[in-house]
C-alpha cells in the first residue's frame, strides 16, 4: 500500500464521482438535442429510454460476471470509457440505431461506474477511515449538484450559440473523467 497513492485517491475521488455522476451537459438538454438536432419525435425519445433500460436490466447478470472477472478498478475505468463512447455516439450518431446503442452504453456504463463506491469503501477501510464514507460521498454529491446547476444554467446559452456546443462540453467532461479514472484504484 502506497500512502501517497491513497491520499491522491482521497483528493480526487469527490471530483471523479461528482463529475462522472451523469453525462452532465446531456442531462440538461437531452430532449431538446434529440428533437432539434436529431429530429426525433416523442415516441422515438420514449422508446430510446425504454429500450436502453430494458437492455440494461437484461444484461445485469452478465455485467456483474464481467465485474467479478475484471475487478473493481478496471470496472470503474471501463464505465468511464463507456460513458465517453456513449457521449460520442449520442452526439455524432446520425441514425436512430446508433443513438440507441449510445443510450444503451450510457446505461451499462453506470453499472460499471458504480463500482467506485466499493473502491472508496475498500480504500477507506485500508486507512481505518471507514466512518468517513458518508463525508466522501457527500462531497462528491455536492460537486455533482453544483456542476449540474451551473451546466443547466449555461447549457441553453451554449445550445443557442451552436446546437452541438453542450455535447462537446459533455464529451470533454467524459474524457477528463476517463483520465481521472486511472487514479481510481482499489488498493
Model-predicted regions and their roles:
Residues 81-95, 99:
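C-terminal ends and interior cores of transmembrane alpha-helices
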Residues 102-144:
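Cytoplasmic helix-loop-helix junction between adjacent transmembrane helices
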Residues 59-71, 159:
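Helix-to-loop junctions at the C-terminal end of transmembrane segments
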Residues 36, 68, 147-170:
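Transmembrane alpha-helix termini and helix-breaking/packing motifs in multi-pass membrane transporters
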Amino acid at each position: 500500500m502506497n500512502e501517497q497513492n491513497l491520499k491522491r485517491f482521497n483528493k480526487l475521488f469527490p471530483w471523479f464521482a461528482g463529475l462522472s455522476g451523469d453525462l452532465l451537459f446531456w442531462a440538461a438538454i437531452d430532449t431538446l438535442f434529440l428533437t432539434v438536432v436529431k429530429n426525433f419525435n416523442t415516441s422515438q425519445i420514449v422508446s430510446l429510454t425504454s429500450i436502453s433500460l430494458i437492455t440494461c436490466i437484461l444484461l445485469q447478470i452478465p455485467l456483474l460476471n464481467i465485474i467479478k472477472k475484471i475487478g473493481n478498478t478496471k470496472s470503474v475505468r471501463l464505465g468511464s470509457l463507456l460513458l465517453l463512447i456513449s457521449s460520442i455516439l449520442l452526439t455524432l450518431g446520425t441514425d436512430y440505431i446508433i443513438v440507441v446503442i449510445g443510450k444503451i452504453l450510457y446505461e451499462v456504463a453506470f453499472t460499471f461506474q458504480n463500482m467506485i463506491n466499493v473502491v472508496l469503501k475498500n480504500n477507506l477501510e485500508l486507512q481505518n477511515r471507514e466512518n468517513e464514507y458518508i463525508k466522501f460521498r457527500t462531497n462528491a454529491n455536492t460537486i455533482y449538484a453544483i456542476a449540474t446547476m451551473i451546466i443547466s444554467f449555461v447549457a441553453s446559452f451554449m445550445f443557442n450559440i451552436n446546437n452541438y456546443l453542450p455535447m462537446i462540453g459533455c464529451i470533454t467532461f467524459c474524457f477528463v473523467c476517463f483520465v481521472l479514472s486511472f487514479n481510481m484504484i482499489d488498493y
